[in-house]
Each structure stands twice: as C-alpha cells, then as structure tokens.
C-alpha cells in the first residue's frame, strides 16, 4: 500500500511502474501479472484513451455541475449558490470518507466486494446473459480496458478493483469540483484586487503565501503519483498485493508522514488565505479533519495489519527497564496537551507543579497589566531555558547533576526523577505564562481577524500533534533526555529513526515552535508575541546545536549525528541550501569547540611554571645551599614529586655573616608567590618552620621541624623536616623559601616540586577502605575510633578531604553526607565505591 492515501509508499523492487508486476490475491494466493492502467486524469480527460460508459458519465456530471454553478450564481444569487455547493461538498466529502471508508473497511477485513462478485458470478463466462448486473460490469470493464484484455484470465480481485476505481473517480472528482466551486463563489466576494497585490501588505502577503501553498500542493500530488502510481492511489492493496514489493520512502513520502493527508491538503489552507474568508477556512478544516478520521480508522489499521506497525513491537523500551529494575520508580508527571499525565497523589512535587499551574491561571482574575504579563512571560522563558541548558550541558560534559545527588547520599535514579520534575515544571511554567500572555493580548485587541485566529489555532494544534509524535517515538526516556542521566540503562545505543524522526531530524526545532508562532497570529502579530516566539525558536535551536548534538555524538557516535532525515535529504538536493548548511555546520562546530575548552587549565599552567622555574631557580645568596633531599623511590633527577602525607626533608647552608637566629623557611604554592623572587608577598598560613630551636621558642611546631643545626666558623647549616603538622594536603606545585630574620626577604628558593594525590585502591569496597585508612593515618587525622576528625590536623579540613577523594577516585562526596554518617570512614568509602561504579557505567 502506498500513501497517496496512506503514510507509506509501496512499490515493486526495481520497478518504475506496477504494469507487468507479479501480484498475488490476498486470500486465494492466485498470482497474475498486473496489466497497464492509467491515472484518474488521463482516464477521464485524455481523448487518446478508451472511455467506459461510467467514465463518460463522470465527465459529463462534472461539466454539468460547473454549468449549474454558473446558472445558480447568475439566477439564484451568490449566497444561495454558496450554500448549495457547500452542501454538495459536504455530501461528497462524507461519501468519500464514510462511504469509501466503509467499503474499504469491510474489504480489508472480509473482502466483501470480492466475495459479492464471486457469489453472483459477475465476471464468469456466460453470466452476462443471466444477470443485468454481470452484463453491465463486464461491459464496463471491456469498454475501459484495451481490446486484447481477457477478463477471464484475471482473478476476480483485479476485476473488482477496476470497477471500484470508477466509483472512486466519481467521488473524488466531485469532491474536488464542488470544493473548488465553493471557493470560487467565496472568492467572488473577496476585496482582493490587482492594484492591492502590487503593494506589500498583509493582503498581498497572504495571497502570495496562499499561491505558494497551492503550487506546493500540486507538486505533492504529482510527486506522490510518480512514486506510487495508480495502484496505491486506488487502494490496490485492499484487493491484491504486489509481490517483491517493499515499503519505500521516496520523494514526498520522504519529507512528511502521511503526505496526502498532511501536506497534501496544504492547498485547502492556501485558498483559505487567498480568499481571506474564515468560512472557507472552517470548511477546509472540517474536510481535512474528516480525512484524518479516514486515515485513523481505515488506512492505518489496514497498513499495520498488512505491513506491520511503524515502530517494531519487539523494541525494548528503556522506561520498562527502569520500572522493572526499580520498584520505587513511578512514571513522571507530564504536561500533555492541556492536562497532566501520570499524576501521583503520593508524590509532593506533582501537587507543587499542578498547584503552580492553577495559581498562575487564577492570576488572570486580578486583571494584570499587559506589560506585567509580558515581562513575567519573557522572564520565565529566559530563566527556564537557561536552567535547562545549564543542567543538560554540565550533565553531558561531567555528569554534574548526577554527581550532585550522589555526593549527598541519594541514588542515580533519584537525581533523574528530580530532573524530570525540574524539566516538566519549566515546561509547564513557560507554556502557561505564554497562554496567559496570549489571552491578555487577545482581549486587548479592538477587533479580531478570525482567519488569523483560526490559522493560529491550527499552528497550536500542529505543535500539540508534533509533541505527541515526538513522545511516541522517543518514549518518556527520550522526552526527559534520559540518555544524559541513565546512559548505563541503554543496552543498544541507537537513535530513534521511526515516526516523525524519519522525516525530521530535529522536529522540536521546526514543529516544536509552531504553537509559539500560532500565538503571533492569534494576537494579530503583536510585537510582544513575536519577541516571545523568536526567543522560543532561538532557545530550541541553541539547545539542539550546543547541547543535544554534541551529546548525541558522544553517546551514539558521529555517524548517527550525521544521519539525514527525509526532509534533510530532499532539501540538501538543492545546491544553495547545501552550501548554507555546510557553512552553518562549520560555524556551530567552532562555537562548540570554544565551549569545550579544557577545565584543566590551572593544572597545565602550574606545570608550565614549574618547568620554567627549574631553569631559573638558583641561590640568591653566594656560597649558599638549599636542597630538597631526594627520595630515590619517588623522585628522579630533575623531577620532585611527593604524595600527600609524605614528609619532606630540606637541607640548607648559609655563610655565617648572613645567618640570623630568626631565619625561617616557608612552604608556598608557586602560583601564589607571584614573580617576585626576592621578597615573599603572601602569607605562609602557618606552613613554616624555624631553622634552629632558639629563634622561636614559643612555636612548638616551628622548632619541632628542626632535625639538625650546626653553626661553624664560616657557615651555618641545618636540616628540617616538613611533616603532617606543616604540609599542605592538596595537590599542586610548591616551593620552599628561606627568609632572612623574621621578615620576608628571600635568601634562597628551592626547586619547585609537586604534591600529588595517591591513587586509592578501587578494586573492592574493603580495598578502598583499607587504602583510605592507611592514607589518613599517615596524615594523622583519624581518632581512636577510626573516624575522621578535623581537630587532629587543622590543615586537613572537610573541604580538603572532599578534594582528596575527588582527585584520587573521581567521585565527589559532600560534607553534609560525611556529617550524616558521623565521619565513619567505612560508610564514606562504601558510598564512594558505589558512586564510582555508577559514574564509570555512565561513560
């Protein structure tokens, strides 16, 4: 089956026409070669083709109807003629959708036309002399088909289909003719003149847009018939099936779902724009709506029964996995259409969302000013968009949102549920405020153009439909950006390529803003709503370009990101559009690269400075020595590196005339000391020691670091050790500075060295616990019960411990959580192990 009457096109493999194609009857399985047939217009109006009795009658009825229209317009008046042809159109439209619909429904389920023909022997040899109906049917087919056509050689299904085509020709041509005549009668009352069209105004714009829509409608019809031929045009697969045929998506079937029911009715709205008559628009909407009912209750069930559903039933839904593996998970609250779905009376956030919506709508009773409502709507849209952008961007780059909850003791799934609440709340708030803004603006209008209003609501309906299609294709998991938060639940990474995503790569950027632009029409092009619609459009494009697309490439691969939709393939066939698309891709790519600047700039800067200082650091005083004693296990020549908690030993030597008892040695971060090598301008923050035991007798820690001191005749030398009482417990590049007397004049500077974070053992929870205890014991910050105690070492605070865990395991944990577990190291390490396991699975 195709869709000039359906969403899918069917064509025989490697064939341009169904003529000569092998076909098979649906029930009997009888095979035959399909003879050549012609489309509707050629059958009726091409004088070179033979005409059957019914085809002549159809042509004459069309001519007679046009003549009667002219007569009734001249004699009975335009209003009477309009009502007459409106009634005719509705009658033929019901005959189409209800009459043909019932026939096809029963033919699809019971093959009742085929069975009726067989039961009455309509095409049997010799039956013509016994039954006037058989005689007429055989005469009709014989007069229509070429002379060499032998009716008896073809199955009943094919002959019945040929007769069914005649009925379809009558109904479709009269349906089209009466609609066109009704539009022409309405256009006769229009105020559109040629002089008016020569100037740029609303009337000329709608006429030009309407004309363009008409031309596009003609292209849709022609291209659809090119793809599917008359086999699908006349619902051939309700009678017989083509062998070796496949569902195809080509031409117009590649750019729209159900093109003959969607964009195939674009002309209806085109003529409504041209006439500017809202009554024509309402009639067009009614006709289009009836056609959608025909699609839903006749076409779609038959397509799914013959070819299977669009979305494979075997597809594994991540939503079902989540529910199956987590008993405490419930489906999230969703704002669908104008109501809420999945409301859970035991979930407080649902009451908050619904209550906020109700309160916002109730605010209309306060008669707020237009300016106030617009400002609130603009503020809400900007803030909600920025919040969504920030969370998703950070979540994509470093799992920030998940880590935020994990570090505070919550689960990965709970963080996802909180995101669902935030996203749905933001969506609800932006839509509710936009609706209120539109209502206030609409009330303020002195007069209303109902044609604009109706077209506005059509765009709103299109937006609602698109959201429904997106939800059907992505499921709740995709709707809430689940692949940002629960990557470990995705067993087979694959982007949705069915439903609306077969035709549009990012439908939210096109159809997802239709409602916002619909409010522009409803409010008669108010500046406020134009601004809001523009922001809506830009925010959607920014989200897709700078958040979704980079994440898709990361999770699903660049080849999935480069996949073209049906509309994209069609449009990129035009060279100017392809050039513009390539330029836009390069531009957005460069912006994405700017956003992806490494966050490790500080670490890299420290390394660069350390390398430079290795060459420039020297003794600032002659005949002096100031060296860090090397540990052969941890350091090699030219590379000083110590692990957090390791003691560092320094040897120094100074001429006696330069030495003072109050000389001291300080420990500093290289980045904090600045470029002054002769004077230290920053505080040591108590990371210092004396050079002897007499200079600072009241400072126990300062003199406790002195391990050796010798005063000779010509020089003074010593050895000090910086241990847990004086060291930093954060990674970085450091240096020691030897200061004269109690001031900050620098006499000597050590080579720069690194303090690094030890890699804790993450093989098992017990291994992590043991390695953590060993490290903290070395740092002297555990009490007798094995708990972390800040008072044991003032340099190793909660914040420092957090950084230590983050840098050594990649998992962050909050101080609030550590307080909740009373700083129990086993509880903390078990939580870190679980976090690390989850975060690794998300990569």
From Swiss-Prot:
The keyword Lipid metabolism applies. It is a multi-pass membrane protein. Residues 1-52, 105-166, 221-246, 301-348, 393-419, 474-512 are lumenal. Pathway: Phospholipid metabolism; phosphatidylcholine biosynthesis. This is Phosphatidylethanolamine N-methyltransferase. It is found in: Endoplasmic reticulum membrane. Belongs to the class VI-like SAM-binding methyltransferase superfamily. CHO2 family. One of its GO terms (molecular function) is phosphatidylethanolamine N-methyltransferase activity. Residues 74-83, 188-197, 268-279, 367-371, 441-452, 534-843 are cytoplasmic.
């Amino acid at each position: 089956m195709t869709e000039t009457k359906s969403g899918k096109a069917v064509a025989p493999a490697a064939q341009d026409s169904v003529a000569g194609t092998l076909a098979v009857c649906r029930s009997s399985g009888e095979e035959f070669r399909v003879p050549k047939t012609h489309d509707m217009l050629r059958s009726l109006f091409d004088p070179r083709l033979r005409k059957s009795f019914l085809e002549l009658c159809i042509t004459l009825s069309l001519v007679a109807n046009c003549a009667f229209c002219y007569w009734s317009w001249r004699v009975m008046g335009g209003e009477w003629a309009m009502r007459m042809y409106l009634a005719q159109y509705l009658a033929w439209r019901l005959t189409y959708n209800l009459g043909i619909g019932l026939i096809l429904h029963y033919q699809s389920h019971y093959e009742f036309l085929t069975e009726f023909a067989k039961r009455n022997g309509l095409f049997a040899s010799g039956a013509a002399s016994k039954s006037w109906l058989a005689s007429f049917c055989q005469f009709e087919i014989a007069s229509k088909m070429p002379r060499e056509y032998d009716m008896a050689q073809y199955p009943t299904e094919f002959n019945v289909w040929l007769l069914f085509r005649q009925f379809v020709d009558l109904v479709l041509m009269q349906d089209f003719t009466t609609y066109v005549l009704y539009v022409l009668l309405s256009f006769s009352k229009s105020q559109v003149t040629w002089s008016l069209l020569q100037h740029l105004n609303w009337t000329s714009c709608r006429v030009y847009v309407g004309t363009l829509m008409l031309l596009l409608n003609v292209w849709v019809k022609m291209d659809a018939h090119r793809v599917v031929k008359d086999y699908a045009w006349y619902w051939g697969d309700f009678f017989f099936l083509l062998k070796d045929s496949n569902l195809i998506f080509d031409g117009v079937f590649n750019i729209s779902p159900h093109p003959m029911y969607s964009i195939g009715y674009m002309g209806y709205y085109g003529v409504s724009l041209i006439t500017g008559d809202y009554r024509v628009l309402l009639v067009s909407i009614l006709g289009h709506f009836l056609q959608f009912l025909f699609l839903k209750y006749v076409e779609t069930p038959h397509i799914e029964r013959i070819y299977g559903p669009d979305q494979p039933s075997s597809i594994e839904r991540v939503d079902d996995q989540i529910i199956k593996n987590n008993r405490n998970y419930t489906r999230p609250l969703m704002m669908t259409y104008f109501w809420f779905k999945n409301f859970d009376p035991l979930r407080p956030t649902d009451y908050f969302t619904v209550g906020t919506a109700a309160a916002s709508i109730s605010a209309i009773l306060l008669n707020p000013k237009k300016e106030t409502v617009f400002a609130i709507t603009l503020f809400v849209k900007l803030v909600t968009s920025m919040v969504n952008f920030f969370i998703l961007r950070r979540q994509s780059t470093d799992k920030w949102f998940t880590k935020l909850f994990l570090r505070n003791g919550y689960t990965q799934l709970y963080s996802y549920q909180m995101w669902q609440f935030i996203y749905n709340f933001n969506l609800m708030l932006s839509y509710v405020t936009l609706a209120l803004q539109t209502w206030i603006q609409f009330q303020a209008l002195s007069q209303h153009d109902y044609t604009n209003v109706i077209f506005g609501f059509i765009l709103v309906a299109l937006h609602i439909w698109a959201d429904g299609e997106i939800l059907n294709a992505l499921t709740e998991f995709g709707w809430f950006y689940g692949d940002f938060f629960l990557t470990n639940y995705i067993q087979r990474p694959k982007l949705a390529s069915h439903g609306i995503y077969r035709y549009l790569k990012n439908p939210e950027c096109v159809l997802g803003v239709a409602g916002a632009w619909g409010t522009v029409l409803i409010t008669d092009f108010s500046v406020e709503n134009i601004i809001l619609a523009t922001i809506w459009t830009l925010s959607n494009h920014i989200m897709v370009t700078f958040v979704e697309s980079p994440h898709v490439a990361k999770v699903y691969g660049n080849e999935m990101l480069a996949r073209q939709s049906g509309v994209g393939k069609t449009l990129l066939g035009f060279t100017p559009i392809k050039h513009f698309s390539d330029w836009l891709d390069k531009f957005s790519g460069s912006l994405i690269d700017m956003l992806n600047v490494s966050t490790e700039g500080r670490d890299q800067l420290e390394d660069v400075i350390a390398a430079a200082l290795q060459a420039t650091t020297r003794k600032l005083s002659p005949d002096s020595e100031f060296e860090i004693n090397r540990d052969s296990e941890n350091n090699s020549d030219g590379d000083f590196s110590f692990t957090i908690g390791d003691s560092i030993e320094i040897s120094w030597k100074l001429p006696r005339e330069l030495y003072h008892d109050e000389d001291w040695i300080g420990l500093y971060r290289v980045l904090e000391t600045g470029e002054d090598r002769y004077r230290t301008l920053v505080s040591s923050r108590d990371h210092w020691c004396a050079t002897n035991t007499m200079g600072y007798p009241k400072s126990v820690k300062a003199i406790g670091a002195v391990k050796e001191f010798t005063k000779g005749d010509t020089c003074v030398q010593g050895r000090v050790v910086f241990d847990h009482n004086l060291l930093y417990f954060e990674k970085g590049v450091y240096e020691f500075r030897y200061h004269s007397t109690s001031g900050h004049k620098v006499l000597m500077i050590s080579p720069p060295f690194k303090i690094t974070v030890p890699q804790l053992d993450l093989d098992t929870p017990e291994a992590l616990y043991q390695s953590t205890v060993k490290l903290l014991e070395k740092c002297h910050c555990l009490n007798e019960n094995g708990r972390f105690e800040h008072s044991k070492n003032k340099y190793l605070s909660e914040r420092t411990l957090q950084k230590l865990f983050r840098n050594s395991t990649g998992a962050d944990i909050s101080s609030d959580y550590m307080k909740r577990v009373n700083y129990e190291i086993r509880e903390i390490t078990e939580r870190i192990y679980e976090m690390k396991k989850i975060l690794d699975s998300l990569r």
